[in-house]
């Protein structure tokens, strides 16, 4: 958009408000969206482009939701965080033998529970985790049908940190805050550490996980060395990329736990240093200019993508408007380097510090600058404000007085935000708020920014690159055919460079009180992704029908493994698990029976599912 009025609209959104990547932290975050007076503080928009929307009762409930958050959600959240911390410390003090013994006993309980299931009478297998606990945008409607519960709540221990093999063996409910608290003092870390403390290993593997180091190591699941899985028949198997269960190993990511129950994972560790040297680079121009500045920040134009001298350890971008963005690159630095005279150390983890996305935005005024951030604080830089969703949850949460007095209780626990809302509120958020990640080839990032601006008008946008590897098997997500021949900027012979365009916040029309079709916007986005070989992480609300779902993702290897390992008829298929809306037991059972009786439809030839030579 190039006119004067759109330019004012872009400037009005510059105050920076954004939502959590990947994650569905924002189901309760529209507490400010219905306050027209609050909009004026963020926007001087004029002449709305769409008809005004009539208010409904939910608008008024959401308008004052911050009261519930401050007096109920935040205190309970802090208490739960503290109790969880005490439990984690207790676990860490146990010996390896104790943790291993507990793990083996808990696995036996899972096997025994599975064997109690009567396939003719009981529903499909689901975990006993309550729907509101999951850190995701979906309503988890599949658990509203009759189902057979298996309790995995005991699987939250770090079993072992093996410094010789550089492997962390962990259980699925171990979260990012827990594992960095253990590994960072050892100058070790997972190769990919998702930003938010509450994100669990199981969710990042079975679903989707990304971080600023993914342009080197790929998605979170790409850093896993082995999975320990309980199959439908109760067998416990260890799947690696080169053993007899290699097909299962490559199928687990993105499967949403529909092939078996993950009970532990062995994940790659890397050596790190005490600080992150972070460079903030502002960029101005149109969206194509911003896209190229982002690409140039971490991809050498000579194609030398594997050269650590030319490629930073961490990359992140934030597009604050259609004309402004800030791109950050980080490199690990020693304590000695950070404390040299003249260097600036910024401990962003203190509760009273400015929220990170707002701090980064200052580069637009003061120009490029460099600072050193303690490594663990850098990893979790977006936790306290949930990217920029904190601004919607608590409209005054970024003010110094609030940060100083109550910032130590932030963030509100996502599970409690979800637990304190009903179905009508959840559906309201689905229509009035966008929480989506668009994974697209890096060379199309400019087109993606253009698309989001025209269809949703959401700012800020979060940019994070990741490698999409070419595997021996064709997995649910895979690179474009022939990418290695084109060798576009960022690509290598073994991986195509993709990027996440994180779209989290209330769209411009909603902020202006105009009519907005949230479901329609998501459908348009999904069609655009399919046409551009992109992917939609399944934590988000999806409008895809089954045919379109399997146009976006590849079904071949997944369905073969479902049948081979007995998951059909025991675990719900990934489409039905991610499908929007309530599923009846009859609907799910009929779908499962159809898979048992008919061959796989509309998938690639069998040779695509065999190991490459």
Give the residues covered by each predicted segment.
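Noncatalytic alpha-helical scaffold of FAD-dependent oxidoreductases
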Residues: 2-613
């Amino acid at each position: 958009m190039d006119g004067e009025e759109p330019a004012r609209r872009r400037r009005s959104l510059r105050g920076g408000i954004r939502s959590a990547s990947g994650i569905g932290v924002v189901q309760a975050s529209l507490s400010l969206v219905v306050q027209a007076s609050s909009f004026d503080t963020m926007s001087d928009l004029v002449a709305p482009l769409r008809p005004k929307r009539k208010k409904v009762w939910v608008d008024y409930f959401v308008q004052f939701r911050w009261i519930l958050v401050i007096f109920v959600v935040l205190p309970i959240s802090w208490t739960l965080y503290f109790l969880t911390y005490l439990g984690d410390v207790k676990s860490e003090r146990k010996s390896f033998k104790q943790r291993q013994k507990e793990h083996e006993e808990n696995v036996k309980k899972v096997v025994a529970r599975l064997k109690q299931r009567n396939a003719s009478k009981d529903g499909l297998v689901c975990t006993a985790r309550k729907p509101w606990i999951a850190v995701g945008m979906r309503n988890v409607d599949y658990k509203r049908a009759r189902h057979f519960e298996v309790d995995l709540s005991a699987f939250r221990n770090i079993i072992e940190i093996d410094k010789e093999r550089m492997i962390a063996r962990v259980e699925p409910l171990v979260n990012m805050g827990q594992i960095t608290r253990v590994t960072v003092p050892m100058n070790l870390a997972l190769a990919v550490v998702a930003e938010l403390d509450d994100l669990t290993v199981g969710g990042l593997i079975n679903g989707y996980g990304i971080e600023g180091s993914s342009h080197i190591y790929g998605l979170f699941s790409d850093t896993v060395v082995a999975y320990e899985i309980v199959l439908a028949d109760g067998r416990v198997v260890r799947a690696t990329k080169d053993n007899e269960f290699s097909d299962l190993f490559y199928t687990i990511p993105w499967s949403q736990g529909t092939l078996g129950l993950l009970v532990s994972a062995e994940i790659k560790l890397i050596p790190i240093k005490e600080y992150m040297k972070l460079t903030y680079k502002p960029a101005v121009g149109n969206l194509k200019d911003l896209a190229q500045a982002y690409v140039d920040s971490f991809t050498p134009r000579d194609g030398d993508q594997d050269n650590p001298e030319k490629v930073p350890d961490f990359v992140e971008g934030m597009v604050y408007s259609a004309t402004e963005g800030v791109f950050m690159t980080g490199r690990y630095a020693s304590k000695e380097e950070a404390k040299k005279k003249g260097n600036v150390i910024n401990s962003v983890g203190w509760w009273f510090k400015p929220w990170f996305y707002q701090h980064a935005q200052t580069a637009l005024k003061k120009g490029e600058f460099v600072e050193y951030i303690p490594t663990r604080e850098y990893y979790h830089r977006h936790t306290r404000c949930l990217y920029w969703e904190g601004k919607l949850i608590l409209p005054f949460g970024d003010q110094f007085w609030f940060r100083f007095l109550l910032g130590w209780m932030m963030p509100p626990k996502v599970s409690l935000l979800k637990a304190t809302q009903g179905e009508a509120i959840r559906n309201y958020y689905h229509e009035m708020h966008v929480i989506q990640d668009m994974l697209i080839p890096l060379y199309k990032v400019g087109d993606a920014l253009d698309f989001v601006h025209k269809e949703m008008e959401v700012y800020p946008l979060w940019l994070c690159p990741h490698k999409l590897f070419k595997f021996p098997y064709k997995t649910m997500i895979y690179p474009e055919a022939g990418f290695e021949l084109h060798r576009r900027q960022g690509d290598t012979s073994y991986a195509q460079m993709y990027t996440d365009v994180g779209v989290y916040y209330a769209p411009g029309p909603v902020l202006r009180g105009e009519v907005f079709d949230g479901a329609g916007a998501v459908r348009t986005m999904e069609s655009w992704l399919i046409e551009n070989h992109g992917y939609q992480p399944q934590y988000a609300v999806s409008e895809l029908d089954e045919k379109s779902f399997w146009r976006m993702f590849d079904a071949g290897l997944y369905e073969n493994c479902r049948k081979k390992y007995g998951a059909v008829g025991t675990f719900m298929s990934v489409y039905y698990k991610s499908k929007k809306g309530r599923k009846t037991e009859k609907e799910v059972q009929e779908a499962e029976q159809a898979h048992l009786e008919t061959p796989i439809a509309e998938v690639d030839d069998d040779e695509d599912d065999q190991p490459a030579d």
